[in-house]
Curated annotation (Swiss-Prot):
Residues 282-293 have a biased composition (Basic residues). One of its GO terms (molecular function) is RNA binding. The keyword Phosphoprotein applies. SMART domains: RRM (SM00360). It is found in: Nucleus, Nucleolus; Chromosome. This is MKI67 FHA domain-interacting nucleolar phosphoprotein. There is a cross-link at residues 38, 139, 179, 192, 271 (Glycyl lysine isopeptide (Lys-Gly) (interchain with G-Cter in SUMO2)). The modification N-acetylalanine is found at residue 2. Its main location: nucleus. InterPro entries: NIFK_FHA_Ki67-binding, Nucleotide-bd_a/b_plait_sf, RBD_domain_sf, RRM_dom. Binds to the FHA domain of MKI67; this interaction is enhanced in mitosis. The gene is NIFK. It comes from Homo sapiens.
Length: 293
């Protein structure tokens, strides 16, 4: 059995005389086939999706929208600083008709306790670089310089940092002196003595403030209430309170040097008089009972 290898040769006609005409017909047929394929190619459609839950990833959203039709490209917008999703994405379907159907059906759809907003984007508004690097997997942004600066250092590493700052400070001062600029700026490294003095000052000021507060509180507790506000609540009329009021009235009268005479009656005598007035009623009742008997 003979085996054929290599690419297929050109199509030849059975009659060698009609070979030229046959090749022209073949070329025309091929053009028609290519034109039909171009006409059959579907125009893609892009859908703008909004109000997406923050916990969803690209793979989950891609698999969810792929049930409507073939998804050619997909992009979920994320923050460059944190890497978290911004809540909106762009989905490109193979056919424009499918994209319009998805936008109509999924608009105002309750998805993860949120109402989705889906809008069809016309091809004029779609940017060329909208789906740039869409197939590259997402990686959380890392800041090595920040991690390096915030890491815990040993004493030797701290001393090295201080030496570097001192060298930079010297170079700056030399450059300014060469250019004839008289400019004094604070040192890049704070001295320990200054920090200790500041802490001592802060503690002393705090102690003084606390002492003043204590004095104010003690003064308010020791001072008795000598006066009574007219607009305030009425005090309870106890015997001691009445005697105090009478003595105050007497002092005021003495100061004015009036000739009026004030009779001070003790409260006990008033009680005795009330008891004496009440006793005859009991005696009359007893007399009536004895007379009836």
């Amino acid at each position: 059995m003979a085996t054929f290898s290599g690419p297929a040769g050109p199509i030849l006609s059975l009659n060698p005389q009609e070979d030229v005409e046959f090749q022209k017909e073949v070329a025309q047929v091929r053009k028609r086939i290519t034109q039909r394929k171009k006409q059959e190619q579907l125009t893609p459609g892009v859908v703008y999706v909004r109000h997406l839950p923050n916990l969803l990833d690209e793979t989950q959203i891609f698999s969810y929208f792929s049930q409507f039709g073939t998804v050619t490209r997909f992009r979920l917008s994320r923050s460059k600083r944190t890497g978290n999703s911004k809540g909106y994405a762009f989905v490109e379907f193979e056919s424009e008709d499918v994209a319009k159907i998805v936008a109509e059906t999924m608009n105002n759809y309750l998805f993860g306790e949120r109402l989705l907003e889906c809008h069809f984007m016309p091809p004029e508004k779609v940017h060329k670089e909208l789906f740039k690097d869409w197939n590259i997997p997402f990686k959380q942004p890392s800041y090595p310089s920040v991690k390096r600066y915030n890491r815990n250092r040993t004493l030797t590493q701290k001393l090295r940092m201080e030496e570097r700052f001192k060298k930079k400070e010297r170079l700056l001062r030399k450059k300014l002196a060469k250019k004839g600029i008289d400019y004094d700026f604070p040192s890049l490294i704070l001295q320990k003595t200054e920090s200790i003095s500041k802490t001592n000052r802060q503690t002393s000021t705090k102690g003084q403030v606390l002492r003043k507060k204590k004095k104010k509180v003690s003064g308010t507790l020791d001072t008795p209430e000598k006066t009574v506000d007219s607009q305030g609540p009425t005090p309870v009329c106890t015997p001691t309170f009445l005697e105090r009021r009478k003595s105050q009235v007497a002092e005021l009268n003495d100061d004015d040097k009036d000739d009026e005479i004030v009779f001070k009656q003790p409260i006990s005598c008033v009680k005795e008089e009330i008891q004496e007035t009440q006793t005859p009623t009991h005696s009359r009742k007893k007399r009536r009972r004895s007379s009836n008997q």
